Amino acid sequence: MKQGEIWYAHLDPVKGSEQSGYRLVVVISGNLLNQYLPVVICFPLTTKIKNYKGNLVLQPDAMNNLTQASEVLTFHIRSVSKERLKKKIGKLTELQTILLKQYLNEILTY
């Protein structure tokens, strides 16, 4: 599991307005952490595009293998067990990964 990869994950059980269900997530934690820890830090994706500031909208392409446009929900960042990640479907470009890290830094200042 590497930074920038897109995986299907089981996110249940959840509390409140946390993103739930079997859904796509983007791994954002660094590769060294991913190599040694039993968890990864990730952002859930949604196909309900709201264009919130600080969220990246991904269009389907051959690299990410998405079937429809998806918004990365940076404000729903969470740590999940690697056991929750079930199937890798693709990855982000290097630029998209850099942008997500910048957006994460921005939401930490709000």
PLM region spans:
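Compact nucleic-acid interaction/catalytic patches
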Residues: 20-22, 27-62
